[in-house]
């Protein structure tokens, strides 16, 4: 019976150690992702695309050190983070929007960027006209 209990104890220690390593890997991946997003925010127009790539690469590096089902979750979080950073970059005018008007899934993209005129010669962006906007008055 002692041998059986000792074996279970060692197995429990192994599971605890594996869980701690996974937790540490996820925490490191989150930290690297945060660093990458902050890096994107600090870059100028020319550096944004490189910054988004850096976020993806740093997250991918950390994900490879994490095992099992956690990888799927971290990858999904990293993908959403990179998509969000790209959307922020496009919304602030740092990068040009895809002229096809389609997202990766093939669905039409909607939003204010569709109406934004682009001058490809000097990459200048103009604010869309205020036609179609309604004044918002909050209720008291």
Swiss-Prot record:
The modification N-acetylmethionine is found at residue 1. Residues 111-140 are annotated as: Interaction with SERF1A. It holds the Pfam family Synuclein. This is Alpha-synuclein. One of its GO terms (molecular function) is identical protein binding. One of its GO terms (biological process) is chemical synaptic transmission. It is found in: Cytoplasm, Cytosol; Membrane; Nucleus; Synapse. The gene is SNCA. Residues 112-140 have a biased composition (Acidic residues).
């Amino acid at each position: 019976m002692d041998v059986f209990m000792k074996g279970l104890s060692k197995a429990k220690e192994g599971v605890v150690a594996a869980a701690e390593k996974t937790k540490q890997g996820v925490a490191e991946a989150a930290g690297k992702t945060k660093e990458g997003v902050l890096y994107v925010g600090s870059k100028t127009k020319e550096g944004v695309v490189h910054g988004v790539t850096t976020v993806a690469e740093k997250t991918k590096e950390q994900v490879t050190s994490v095992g099992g089902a956690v990888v799927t979750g971290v990858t999904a979080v990293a993908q959403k983070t990179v998509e969000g950073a790209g959307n922020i970059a496009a919304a602030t005018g740092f990068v040009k929007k895809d002229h096809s008007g389609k997202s990766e899934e093939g669905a039409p993209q909607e939003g204010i960027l569709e109406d934004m005129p682009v001058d490809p010669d000097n990459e200048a962006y103009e604010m869309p006209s205020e036609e179609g906007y309604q004044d918002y008055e909050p209720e008291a």
